[in-house]
A protein has these predicted regions:
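Structured alpha/beta reader/binder surfaces that contact nucleic acids or chromatin modification marks
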Residues: 5-26, 30-143
């Protein structure tokens, strides 16, 4: 007899948009390399860079206030960063605002190159397997 598994529905796992954090809106998901992922989690790196190209302009324009390719304000929104692709990958959700400027070489930016800069204000949630995690308020209290 074949055993029937009761896997969570796609809408029930944390791989999909987490509505608790977004207030019902979609969330931008960005994969980043392991080095930068852990530098952000330790607080050593406070920015993530994306090339100013139509692909990122379209994606970022959906969640940030932009005209053409220029951010209009410093409004924060939550972004999910993952270390790799797939279901069980380390991830965190952070409050970010968007700027367009040059970046820091020690954080992976090329000199004299303009980027979309996601400035990370606060990490709200993190998980090393993307299946569960802790809210920032819980970890600050030592829970």
């Amino acid at each position: 007899m074949v055993e029937k598994h009761n896997y969570p529905k796609k809408s029930e796992n944390l791989w999909t948009v987490n509505l608790e954090f977004t207030g019902g809106n979609g969330m931008l998901v960005l994969p980043i390399k392991k080095k930068w992922f852990y530098m952000i989690l330790t607080g050593e790196k406070r920015e993530e860079y994306r090339d100013v190209k139509p692909y990122y302009t379209t994606r970022l324009n959906k969640i940030f206030n932009m005209v053409d390719d220029i951010p209009l304000d410093y409004a924060e929104t939550q972004v999910r960063f993952t270390n790799g692709y797939g279901y069980k990958v380390p991830a965190f959700i952070a409050d970010c605002h968007l700027e367009k400027r040059t970046g820091r070489k020690e954080w992976g930016a090329e000199p004299d190159t303009e980027y979309y800069v996601l400035v990370i204000e606060k990490i709200r949630w993190k998980s090393m397997d993307n299946l569960g995690g802790y809210l920032a308020a819980q970890t600050e209290r030592g829970v």
